[in-house]
Amino acid sequence: MSTPHSDSAFVRACRGERTDVTPVWFMRQAGRSLPEYREVRGTGTILRAIADADLATEITLQPVHRYGVDAAILYSDIMTPVHAIGFGVDIAPGVGPVVEHPFSGRDDLERLRPLDPAADTPYVLETVRNLVTELQVPLIAFAGAPFTVASYLIEGRPSRTYVRTKALMHTDESLWFELMDRLADLAIDSLRSQIDAGAAAAQLFDSWAGALSPADYERFVLPASTKVLGAIEATGVPRIHFGVNTAELFDLIAAAGAEVVGVDWRTPLDRARSRVPAPTSLQGNLDPAIVAAGWEPTRVAALDVLRRGGGNPGGRGGHVFNLGHGVLPETDPATLERVVELVHSTPPGAATEETAS
């Protein structure tokens, strides 16, 4: 099936095809590290900026113009669909998603009505349509995976322990699976609408899946993520599945159905590749904190990532260069500019231990 930008290095690497250059983009490449972002964002809220299609378009384009990355990712938030259906979510500066009335029981299922993208998130569709007419690189659609979104709804804000989430999971399986099913449908409807509007790839963010044991992930989370990724398979766009601290889950994350598994900085890419079936591609995995430390440590670490990414060794899968999580606010944009130059100037498979020292 022909899809937008199907001949681009990014899409080809996602599909496990060999490329002449390693494609690169950065999670949170549009954001607080960019002075031009801070200038246009002003003092309004993130959700208000997302709802302004012209502003969201400009913010999405900023890192593409500055860095010369090989893909853009829509400026939005994984909680946008839940906010749009009126669940009562805000994005608090320095905190993250905050839920006014957290999910606590079966009655709250009624608050999770189906998403009608044309009516509930028309600004997202307008932003995507704006971008596909202006971009020369693929646009990545994205959504929050059911578990990560559920954790915010249940905990009420970011959590380190996920006590309430795991308690619901283990004490009321019926309610848990109904919640996951509804959140899967929200993600599906959001992703399909972005893809129909012209996005060329899709990333499912299960940021906090690493808080789970393999057994809990397989039983309580994998079915819903598989449902989401399976529902968009027919669109033909490559699918990326990313979580943080998921080394023990790589085989299960790959089993959910994406062409690409995102890897954080904790696991070397060559080790990650041994844990996923061929020809699964990998995305990652430069440590964002090292990038914030300046150029020389970044150069060494980036070359090591390229060496371990391997340029599709033996046809086992492609490599999309990225950070292991989002760009930190204190990152110097000039360092990321140099990372892109380095990645593009190093032929796939050419980095060695000597070049990385």
Which sequence ranges carry the predicted segments?
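N-terminal basic, low-complexity leaders that serve as flexible interaction/assembly modules and, when applicable
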Residues: M1-P93, K227, G311, P333-S357
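Structural preference for beta-strand elements that scaffold enzyme active sites
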Residues: T19-V21, W25, A71-I73, P138-I140, ...
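Conserved, mostly hydrophobic/aromatic
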Residues: P23, V64, L131, A187, ...
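Active-site mouth loops of central-metabolism enzymes
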Residues: G42-A56, Y162-D189, D287-P297
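Active-site-proximal, glycine-rich beta->alpha crossover segments in alpha/beta enzymes
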Residues: D90-S190
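Active-site-adjacent beta->alpha loops and helix N-cap segments on the catalytic face
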Residues: T121, L212-S225, W265-P279
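Alpha/beta enzyme core
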Residues: R157-W208, P214, E218-A231, T235-P238, ...
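Catalytic-face loop-and-helix region of soluble metabolic enzyme cores
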Residues: G230, A234-S357
